[in-house]
Every structure is written in structure tokens, then in C-alpha cells.
Curated annotation (Swiss-Prot):
Name listed for the protein in its UniProt record: UvrABC system protein C
Gene Ontology cellular-component annotations: cytoplasm; excinuclease repair complex
HAMAP family registered for this protein in UniProt: UvrC
Domain UVR, residue spans: 204-239
The keyword DNA-binding is annotated on this UniProt entry: no
UniProt-listed GO biological process terms: nucleotide-excision repair; SOS response
Chief localisation class: cytoplasm
Disulfide feature: none
Length: 604
């Protein structure tokens, strides 16, 4: 149990001189730091020395009310446990990198006519995967480029299996029409092979093959085919110019550089991904809780948190020396092959590192400019509302269509940025459809009932997308919950509903507050309100589409769950069912001629 009078020096004497992990707790029982050690007694005792501690560590030590330890069999095991605990507990004094979703891949499915697709998740040996890519946008743009060059299908099998005529992608020359037999399996497989070779970095081989085909077509006076192959070569060369890294070979590597702004303790880590000699793009990370940490400490935290339990390229190039021996062994064991971490690259690899360092510095500068702007906006809002202090703002919006599929959203702004990991949507049921006041009451009660019992962070300000009626309801809820000390502000649209004409409804004054359309406080309110609106609409549309997809068919007499599922599976969704002829509908299991005619009529 945490003890306000915790004696660290006495506690150290009870620790073994063995490898392990230690967790430091404050008086509230929260874990504020997690660390690993080869020798627990020696490492933990270093925190209770009279000298040599940084101001940050001194502050942390002053808050320690207890320490928990776990002995491990080795330093490697301690590192793995430390990494898992940091990710799960997010202690305030550990450097934290956001644990993103798994990286996306480009997928070629196993099929007589393989499908080209975006994929994120566990890998299946039956299919071909290319990547990983730094973000979804790079994958999607790559798919578009490959469609243009190789004309591979992207449709789901459920759609592919039941098409009777080519789709729009065929008409705009982005697909070769395998669904209706407009290309032979052999010719299609050749296109798949060329696409795979290109993704594997064998661009020159692919270009040479296409060039030979072009000359053959020209010799045979098939000038239309020769022109198509020429265009294909030109498109591939453009892609090659954009993405190829002059490596001399098809190399897989990650290049990592770090930039630090000491005065603000801001840090940016840039990760450049090179796969099969192609520059797939880069991604920048902004860690939390950095304080006065140096570049080596930040990079070591990044490599540990980013690569353990994730696919790793054979080469990782770092912009600063770190303790590589243990990490290199762990990553190699995890990958099943040798992983090399190098901190002193030369030649072309040094150029890659310089590129990553420039990316990190640029991203850091942009982030600091944006943060300064956000700080100015937040300060302006604080002054406009005459509030003592603002850091965390939560905003609510309600979205529905004539009372259908009502969704409430809550978005969070904290520490000068939107925190989308803390966004929440709420399904609103059990109210009169279209009653926005009841919907707002419901979401606020659900959101803040737990907070009233000290189970989470309380906001410094609550924004409500609505006018006096919504604010009245919100005030009643907060009084009922005993949270009426949290300021509420309603954001009401002006008479013409144009941005810049918003009225701010303040419960503590009679008149609405009007801010000039160029006021930084208004810009911040608009930013947060628009994000709540977007998030609510997105959830509402998804819920409405799901509801309508089910109900439209089930409202037809004779269509139950089983027949509905058969129809949706056969035609790849409700749109396919609507486009089907009576004869095509009748071919579905369980659908008679008369029922097919009824479905056809009802969906028109």
C-alpha cells in the first residue's frame, strides 16, 4: 500500500541484487514510473542519492509513496515486461509513444483472379503481403497507381462472383474485367506477377518485360496494344522516380532520426520506411513526458516501444548511439533472423539518415508553430469567458435524421490538441425520436455519472452544440450530479447559420456573447465544435446505413433473416440486390419466382 512517509533507503535494503522491473507509485496508488534493472537493489538505490539527480527525477522521487518490484530471469525478460507495463499503464514520468494500430499492408489474395486490397491485421500465409506502409494513405495511393498500370481487380469476392457485366473501373481502364471473362486467367496472372515483382523492387525486370512486349506488338502491327504498353511503361517510370531510393539493391530498412527543442522539451521522431529499395514514405511521432531526456534516451524508448511484438526490417538505421546489444538480440529472436541496428551509417545510408533528420526537424518546427497558435487561442478563450484556467475541454453534439439512428458524440481537447483516442460515441435509445433535449440529457448523465464518483478526468469546460434549451438541460444534469462547478457554454448558430456568426450561450449571464469572426477564441471553439459534429455524423451515418440495410429487406413480406443474408451474400450488399433482375434474384436459394418479383418491385 502507498505510504506518505515511505522510506526509500530502508526499502532498498530489502531488494535482491537480481534483474527485474520496478514500479513507482504515488500517494493515490497510481504508477508514475516503470523501469528495468540488471540489479534491482543498485538501480533503485540510485534514486535516493543526495546528488546527481535531474530536476525531473527529483520531482518524481518526491512523489514516491511506494515501490513494487518483479524479479525476472534476465535483463531481456525485464525489458519485455517493462515495455508491456509502460504501454498498459502509461506512467506520467516515462517517455510515451502513441501505440498506433498495426501498420497497413498491400494485399494480393490467393484466387484464380487475385484481388488487390488494403489490409491491416494478422498476416495469413495463403496471401501475398507488401509493406508495411507508414500510413493508410500511402497504401491507397499505391493501389490506385497499380490499378492504372496493371488493371487488377479490387472488388470483394462476393461482388466478383455475381457480376454479369463489367463495372465502372473497367470502363475507365482501371480493371481488366476478369469478373465477366474479358481477360484469361493466364494473362491476368501475368499482370499479378508483374505487379508483385514491381512491389518487390524488381522494377527494371518489369520494365524490360513490358518493353519486349511493346516491340513484339509493334512488329505485329498491333499498334493499339503497343501504345497501351508504352503508356504502362511511362506510368511505371513515374512511380519509380517518386518512390525509388538509389540503394543499388532491393533493401528493406527503417531509418530513424530525432529532433529536440530543449526550451520547450518538445521532441519529434521521424521514421522513414524503405522496402525493396522503394521509399514508401515517412511518419513522425511526438512522444509525451520527454522533459529533459536526451536523444539517445528518446530513441531507445522509441525502438523498444515501437518494434517489440511487431514486424521488424532486417536493418534499422539510427541517428544517435544507443545501447544496441540487448535490443538487437531481442529483435533478432523475435524476427527469427538477424536484425542489425546501426548508429554510424556511411555513404547513401547517411543520406537517408540526413533526410530523416531533416523531416524530424521540419515536423518539430511545424508542431511548435501549431502549438503556439493553439496556446494563443486557448488563452484568448480563457480571457473571453473570464475563466481562471483552461486545459481540458469536452464538446457534445447530437446527430440523427428525423429522429432515426440518434448518436451523441463527445470529443476531447487537452494540452493544446484534439485527443481522438479519448473520443466517445453514445447510442441514444429509449427517447422520443427527434427529442434533442432528451438525447443531450442521456449522454451527459452517462458521461459524467462515473466522473462524479472520481473515475476519470474532469474537464475544465464543457461545450454544447446548441442554444439556450440545450444549456438549460445540461445545467440541470450537472447540478443533479454535483458537478455544477464545471463551466458550460452553448455554441448556437447565428440567424444565417454561417461560420463566424455563432452566439455563445453562457449560463452565468443574460445576453449571448458574440465574438468577432477573426477572434482566436472563436476559432478554437469552431475547431472543437466542428470535430464533435463530424464525429457524430460519421457515427450516425454508419448506424443509419446498418439499420436500413437490415430493415429494407426484412420489411418485405416473406424475407426473414436467413433469406436476407443469402441475398446480401450473393449480390455483395443491398445495392447489388437492388440492381439485380428478377431472374438473378430467383437464382438465390430460398427465393421463388413470385418472391423475386415482390423483391424487385419493393426495391424500385
Amino acid at each position: 500500500m502507498p505510504d506518505a512517509h515511505f522510506d526509500g533507503k530502508a526499502f532498498v535494503l530489502t531488494l535482491p541484487a537480481q534483474p527485474g522491473v520496478y514500479r513507482m507509485l504515488n500517494a493515490a496508488g497510481d504508477v508514475i514510473y516503470v523501469g528495468k534493472a540488471i540489479d534491482l537493489r543498485k538501480r533503485v538505490s540510485s534514486y535516493f542519492q543526495k546528488s546527481g539527480l535531474s530536476p525531473r527525477i527529483q520531482l518524481m522521487v518526491s512523489q514516491i509513496a511506494g515501490i513494487e518490484t518483479t524479479v525476472t530471469r534476465s535483463e531481456a525478460e525485464a525489458l519485455l515486461l517493462e515495455n508491456n507495463l509502460i504501454k498498459s499503464l502509461a506512467p506520467r514520468y516515462n517517455i510515451l509513444f502513441r501505440d498506433d494500430k498495426s501498420y497497413p499492408y498491400l494485399l494480393l489474395t490467393r484466387h484464380i483472379f487475385p484481388r488487390l486490397a488494403f489490409y491491416r491485421g494478422a498476416l495469413d500465409d495463403r496471401h501475398q503481403y507488401f509493406g508495411p506502409f507508414p500510413n493508410a494513405g500511402v497504401v491507397k495511393s499505391s493501389i490506385q497507381l497499380l490499378q492504372k498500370v496493371f488493371r487488377l481487380r479490387t472488388c470483394e469476392n462476393s461482388v466478383f462472383d455475381h457480376r454479369t457485366r463489367p463495372c465502372l473501373l473497367y470502363q475507365i481502364k482501371r480493371c481488366s474485367g476478369p469478373c465477366v471473362g474479358l481477360i484469361t486467367p493466364e494473362a491476368y496472372q501475368q499482370d499479378v506477377k508483374s505487379a508483385a515483382m514491381f512491389l518487390q523492387g524488381k522494377q527494371d525486370e518489369v520494365l524490360k518485360t513490358i518493353e519486349q512486349k511493346m516491340f513484339t506488338a509493334s512488329d505485329q502491327q498491333d499498334y493499339e496494344q503497343a501504345a497501351q504498353l508504352r503508356d504502362q511503361m511511362q506510368a511505371l517510370r513515374k512511380i519509380q522516380e517518386k518512390q525509388f531510393v538509389d540503394s543499388g539493391k532491393a533493401l528493406d530498412a527503417d531509418v530513424i532520426a530525432c529532433a529536440i527543442e530543449p526550451d520547450s522539451h518538445a521532441v519529434a521522431v521521424n521514421l522513414v520506411m524503405i522496402r525493396s529499395g522503394r521509399h514508401l514514405g515517412d511518419k513522425t511521432f511526438f512522444p509525451q513526458n520527454v522533459y529533459e531526456a536526451d536523444i539517445s534516451t528518446v530513441l531507445e524508448a522509441f525502438v523498444t516501444q515501437h518494434y517489440l511484438n511487431r514486424s521488424v526490417p532486417p536493418l534499422i538505421i539510427l541517428g544517435q548511439k544507443i545501447r544496441v546489444t540487448l535490443l538487437q538480440k531481442l529483435l533478432s529472436d523475435q524476427a527469427g533472423h538477424k536484425i542489425t541496428l546501426t548508429t554510424n551509417p556511411i555513404g547513401e545510408r547517411r543520406k537517408w539518415l540526413d533526410m530523416a533528420a531533416e523531416n524530424a526537424q521540419l515536423a518539430l518546427q511545424q508542431m511548435l508553430i501549431q502549438q503556439a497558435s493553439q496556446e494563443d487561442r486557448l488563452q484568448a478563450l480563457q480571457e473571453a469567458l473570464n475563466l481562471p484556467g483552461l486545459a481540458r475541454i469536452e464538446c457534445f453534439d447530437i446527430s440523427h435524421t428525423m429522429g432515426e439512428a440518434t448518436i451523441a458524440s463527445c470529443v476531447v481537447y487537452d494540452r493544446f490538441a484534439m485527443r481522438n483516442g479519448e473520443y466517445r460515441r453514445y447510442n441514444i435509445t429509449g427517447i422520443v425520436p427527434g427529442d434533442d433535449y432528451a438525447a443531450m440529457r442521456d449522454v451527459l448523465q452517462r458521461r459524467y455519472a462515473k466522473l462524479a464518483m472520481e473515475e476519470g478526468k474532469l474537464p475544465d469546460l464543457i461545450l454544447i452544440d446548441g442554444g439556450k434549451g440545450q444549456i438549460r438541460v445540461a445545467s440541470e444534469v450537472m447540478i443533479e450530479l454535483g458537478l455544477n462547478d464545471i463551466p458550460l457554454v452553448g455554441v448556437a448558430k447565428g440567424e444565417t447559420r454561417k461560420p463566424g456568426l455563432e452566439q455563445l450561450i453562457l449560463p452565468w449571464q443574460e445576453e449571448a456573447l458574440h465574438l468577432p469572426d477573426d477572434h482566436p477564441a472563436l476559432h478554437l471553439i469552431q475547431q472543437i465544435r466542428d470535430e464533435a459534429h463530424r464525429f457524430a455524423i460519421q457515427g450516425h451515418r454508419a448506424k443509419r446505413a446498418k439499420t436500413r440495410k437490415i430493415s429494407t429487406l426484412e420489411q418485405i413480406s416473406g424475407i426473414g433473416t436467413k433469406r436476407r443474408q443469402s441475398l446480401l451474400t450473393r449480390f455483395g450488399g443491398l445495392k447489388g440486390v437492388k440492381n439485380a433482375s428478377i431472374e438473378e434474384l430467383q437464382q438465390t436459394e430460398g427465393i421463388s419466382r413470385s418472391l423475386a418479383e415482390k423483391i424487385y418491385r419493393e426495391l424500385r
